[in-house]
Amino acid sequence: MGYFFRGAIMTERADRGAIILAAGLGTRMKSERAKVLHEVFYRPMIAYVAGTVLQAGVTRVVCVIGHQKEAVQAALAGLPVGTAVQAEQKGTGHAVLCAQAACAGLTEILILCGDTPLLRPETLSAMLAQHRQHRPALTLMTTKVARPYGYGRILRAEDDGVAAIVEEKDATKVERLITEINAGVYLAEAAFLFSALARVDTNNSQAEMYLTDIVAIARRSGQQVQPFFHDQPQDVLGVN
């Protein structure tokens, strides 16, 4: 199956890569089909996401697969995308680590989920440009929604950077009133990313490695976490 791109490809950089997380079971879909294989206008969601990343000028794209991995690979046929396997579901942080070898030589790594088919290449391109201008350890895409229930809330620091992401179950009553949320798109300096992931533990209710923990690790080590605010929340909606 061939795929079309939405618009022109942005400026490419050989040192810039992306990791697309697509190994999950998608249990909330209550479907036998892997979540990223569900179609939007007759195309699997994962194909939209991979195409968007490529259009944003990212030349090395690695899709982390696990559940129904052969079918996900087939959905990516025709796109210049590599794969890495997460054999066991040990969390989003662990999924990124599964792609570490495939990211050798990269200086910047974009991380996003495979269930965001409405994300636009120009949005990612703007995020990449902001990151390159300021060079924080981590840039985190945020947005605001009227009903933030279920999303990780963004706590801002005094310097207006991101101080932390607080998940719904851990938020106080005051924190639950925050409408700025984690959009689930990260752009990290590669050296920081993998050193931070080496410090992420599994001391949580799910006994998993959470990618979101790298925000607190960056702040504790005195490194900057910069928000990239996107004012169109519908673009970053995930599918459940």
Roles of regions detected by a PLM:
Residues 163-240:
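Catalytic-core segments of class I nucleotidyltransferases/pyrophosphorylases
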Residues 22, 65, 113, 142-143:
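Short beta-strand/turn micro-motifs composed of small residues
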Residues 2-17, 44-129, 133:
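Conserved N-terminal catalytic core of the sugar/cofactor nucleotidyltransferase
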Residues 134-144:
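A short, conserved acidic/glycine-rich loop-to-beta-strand motif
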Residues 9-31:
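N-terminal nucleotide-binding beta1-loop-alpha1 segment
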Residues 109, 114, 122, 141, ...:
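His/Asp/Glu-rich metal-coordinating catalytic cores
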Residues 33-39, 200-203:
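Short glycine-enriched, charge-decorated loop/helix-capping segments at active-site entrances
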